[in-house]
Structures are given as structure tokens and as C-alpha cells.
Amino acid sequence: MTEYKLVVVGAGGVGKSALTIQLIQNHFVDEYDPTIEDSYRKQVVIDGETCLLDILDTAGQEEYSAMRDQYMRTGEGFLCVFAINNTKSFEDIHHYREQIKRVKDSEDVPMVLVGNKCDLPSRTVDTKQAQELARSYGIPFIETSAKTRQRVEDAFYTLVREIRQYRLKKISKEEKTPGCVKIKKCVIM
């Protein structure tokens, strides 16, 4: 069974935990309890393939920012979440993306931009703005509601598909590189 390491990032209070718990446990948590770091595992079938999702739900609060590098190193794909009623959380996405690229030392990291809380009438981030940002990053954009479960699965499953494409690209690039021999080094003590 293929395992996918997904990391949910974004500012505090945007609904990262609510999205994750909605996917894992099928219920909405409406009380806000700031996360330090929680890990969840769920077996799902995506496009006919049985997968194990290893989801890391992270702290949005600045006081935990020192922990970010560590979980960004281990993650394969990132859900970059903002709240559609919080412009600052949308502006913060740029910082998360830059940090991910720096830690992964790559321009090409599987990501999905997620605009959460689309059930709320008090929108401050226009859908077009978010679509344009996602297009400029070359990543998908999905609006979700953790409360109503709208497109929650879609967000996570789209990220898995992005990781699959990334893995395939990486394999074909390695096969096309002429004269490259993988050398594995072992140290026996």
C-alpha cells in the first residue's frame, strides 16, 4: 500500500484541524483549540489505488514557527490553507510557500491552495484572487467548508494526485539522465 505524507499548513484559526478531523472522523469540531502538532492516519481508495494518508496537522501560531522546518522536511505534499474571511491568512500563504520551497530546496513541491470556510457569507478574499495566486504558483485551488464537508475529500485527494504526478516526473527524469549511476554508501560500525 502506498503511503503519502501530507502536511496541513496555514495561519492560526483558518480551520486546518477542522478540515483534517472532518476527513478522518467525519465530524465538525466547532470549538477552537489551537494545535501544536497532531498526526492522523487514514486508509482510503483514490482512483482505484488503496493509499495510506499520513496527515500532519500543524500549528498556525507564530510561537510554534520553529517547529515548521522539521515537519516541512518530512512532508511530501502540502495543503496551504487560508480562510476566505481572513485576508491576512491569505497573504500569509506566500510565506508558508517560500518556507516550504526553502526547506525542501526545490521550486517544485506538491501543493494545493485551499480556501476554507466557504460556507460563511462574510468573504474578504475573492475567489478570483485565490485562483490567480494558485495559477501563478502552478498549483490547484479548492474552496472548502470543514463545517459542511464541502470538497474536503477533494482537497486532500487532489494533493495525493499532485504527489503522484511529482513522483512519476521524478522517476522519468532519473531514467532519462544518461550515464547516471546511483551509488549507495554504507558505513558498518
From Swiss-Prot:
**Regulation acting on activity, per entry:** Alternates between an inactive form bound to GDP and an active form bound to GTP. Activated by a guanine nucleotide-exchange factor (GEF) and inactivated by a GTPase-activating protein (GAP). Interaction with SOS1 promotes exchange of bound GDP to GTP.
Membrane-related topology note: Lipid-anchor
Q: Name one Pfam family in it.
A: Ras
Q: Which GO terms describe its molecular function?
A: G protein activity; GDP binding; GMP binding; GTP binding; GTPase activity; LRR domain binding; protein-containing complex binding; protein-membrane adaptor activity
- Tell me where it resides: Cell membrane; Endomembrane system; Cytoplasm
Other information:
This gene is amplified in the mouse adrenal tumor Y1 cells, and is also directly linked to lung tumor susceptibility.
The entry's family comment says: Belongs to the small GTPase superfamily. Ras family.
Q: What is this protein called?
A: GTPase KRas
Q: Which organism is it from?
A: Mus musculus (Mouse)
